[in-house]
Regions:
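Solvent-exposed, low-complexity, repeat-rich "mucin-like" stalks and linkers
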Residues: 61-101
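Canonical position 11/12 of the leucine-rich repeat
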Residues: 18-22, 39-44, 61-65
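Conserved hydrophobic position(s) of the canonical leucine-rich repeat
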Residues: 11, 31, 50-53, 64
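Short beta-strand elements
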Residues: 141-156
Length: 156
């Protein structure tokens, strides 16, 4: 059956798996311990008002974002909303491009590729005609976790 708000209020400890959203957990007002490690969760804001939540395990989070990114005029743009527990959008800490043919990883200079809104622009000038995995890495120092999300850049 369905879980009631009353049942949510009884939760003290919870381990979550195979989740993409924390929606509904805002009703677990007595939650003290939560383990959401290894999930594809991008928004932790439903936890914002859980005052008793002192044990949060969220390291790491991440996954593959469906769909492909295509370059236009030698520029590929990627925007992803990763929201921390306080409802604040996190900016990527690093952007890594992998060449699928050579298996080389290239970490881009954050200052050159991210604007103030967190939109990542990758200059594809000089890229081979190939598929490139793009890794966006986020870090929340307050709750001590990192998130890594992967996009596929289609430069064919």
């Amino acid at each position: 059956g369905e879980i009631t708000i009353g049942q949510m209020r009884q939760l003290v400890s919870l381990k979550v798996s195979n989740a993409e959203s924390l929606e509904g957990l805002q009703y677990a007002i007595n939650l003290e311990s939560l383990d959401i490690s290894y999930n594809e969760i991008r928004d932790l804001s439903p936890l914002k008002n859980l005052k008793k939540l002192t044990d949060l395990k969220a390291n790491p989070l991440g996954g593959l974002i469906s769909g492909r990114v295509y370059a236009e005029d030698n520029k590929a743009k990627v925007s992803l909303d990763v929201i921390n527990r306080n409802g604040e959008k996190l900016l990527p800490k690093s952007v890594i491009v992998k060449h699928n043919k050579t298996h080389e990883y290239n970490t881009l200079d954050i200052n050159d590729c991210i604007d103030e809104n967190g939109v990542v622009t990758i200059d594809t000038t000089g890229f081979d005609s190939y598929i490139y995995p793009i890794y966006l890495v986020y870090e929340d120092k307050v709750d001590n976790y990192t998130s890594q999300f992967m996009f596929m850049l289609d430069n064919i």
